[in-house]
Regions:
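Short loop/turn segments that flank or connect secondary-structure elements
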Residues: 1-20, 26-29, 43, 60-272
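Charged, glycine/proline-rich intrinsically disordered loops and linkers
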Residues: 34-69
Length: 272
């Protein structure tokens, strides 16, 4: 049973959605450009192919014959029925869903089946607070970045912890507009643009993978001659790999400046 005021993180509004639980970011090449091409092609073929009950299987075989199956983590299934739900390509989601097929629910044909797909709730629903959910859905308007961030619990929790400590309160989600929204968006956009991101193909956030096994990565601060950074959880979420002490210091400065800019702007706006 869903709690009162339930926030649907999978499809929060008409401008974005998340497909992470469908394996969207588990492809070896999960860049925006690659995923857009993959989803766009699937959506087109699905619309052209699926007209009756057995057609989804024809679609599935065709997609598997033309797409690269390479994955980061072997155990996570990448669902071929994930595509764009709208012509503007703002929202990703299940092409088998009844809302995409004139009321006919075809999700039993998927790998996990209708019941699991319809009822799955990811850990972010439980560990990210209501205020954080409302704020993040207001900050990020893009499906690609939104999916990367809403599923990264450490990144979300740590950022809101630092800014909340700085302003001595939990920021109200309504405040995330104008300059405050831009500053917060700059931070979460580091998920894509972080200059110290590891180039290892088997890294994803704080995890690294070896076939069907996964482990949590660590930053070797002893090798860098540093104590553990107060931004360590953020660094791991950003898939960081620092080669020198100077790179670590620069990384800390990027995070520190963003947090301090947000705090200063928030306090200034509160006075006006």
């Amino acid at each position: 049973m869903k709690e009162e005021g339930f926030i649907h993180l999978c499809q929060p509004d008409s401008g974005k959605s998340c497909g992470a639980c469908c394996g969207l970011y588990n492809y070896a090449d999960s860049t925006r450009e690659s995923l857009v091409d993959r989803l766009r092609n699937r959506t087109r073929i699905f619309r052209e192919t699926v007209k009756k009950a057995n057609d989804p299987k024809v679609f599935l075989n065709r997609i598997r014959s033309i797409e690269s199956p390479e994955r980061i983590y072997d155990t996570i299934h990448c669902c071929e029925y994930l595509g764009f739900l709208d012509d503007e390509e703002k929202r990703v989601g299940c092409l088998l869903h009844p809302l995409q097929n004139d009321g006919e629910d075809m999700r039993d044909l998927s790998f996990y089946g209708r019941e699991l797909c319809a009822g799955h709730i990811c850990p972010s629903y439980h560990f990210i607070s209501r205020d954080e959910k409302l704020s993040l859905t207001r900050i990020v308007d893009d499906w690609y970045l939104y999916g990367l961030c809403i599923t990264d619990i450490d990144l979300v929790k740590e950022y809101f912890r630092f800014i909340s400590e700085g302003i001595c309160e939990v920021p109200r989600y309504e405040r995330f507009e104008g300059r405050l929204k831009d500053i917060a968006l700059d931070f979460f956009s580091l998920k894509i643009s972080w200059p110290f991101r590891s180039t290892d193909a088997n890294r994803f956030g704080k995890y690294y993978f070896d076939g069907s096994q996964y482990m949590i990565s660590h930053i070797d601060y002893d090798h860098l001659g540093y104590e553990r950074s107060r931004f360590d959880k953020i660094f791991l979420s950003l898939t960081s790999s620092f080669r020198t002490p100077d790179e670590l210091r620069e990384g800390e400065e990027i995070i520190r400046k963003n947090i301090e800019e947000f705090i200063s702007c928030y306090k200034t706006d509160a006075i006006l």
